[in-house]
């Protein structure tokens, strides 16, 4: 119980880097190739893990050009539009993949256990909070600023 009393509460923006995926002008459908680095889209955010069917891919050149959108083990990827409370954890098998413009990437800093943070986002109370801060009636959406408000 003493640990709970001494527990600090932080905003997500203070304990993680939050990045929006590449905008349409940076990555076009014409850039997709048959063999290359997979790109996670909203459609690939499965039940806590990525679904791997019909993944778009980009060339090594585009991966280098868009290197700030490369995922690392421990990242958490969110839907930026629609089901904004849906997220998937980047495990070792998906390290080096990329994420699309309709996603947000959360990269916890070194002091934060990424799996702990991921499980926090899987809690129904946290999911409800994310749904509540979303903007838009027809198509809910979140951005880096809104997601950064999660505490």
Tell what function each PLM region has.
Residues 13-28, 43-73:
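Sequence-specific dsDNA recognition surfaces
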Residues 27, 46-58, 76-100, 114-119, ...:
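Short, ligand-facing micro-motifs at secondary-structure edges
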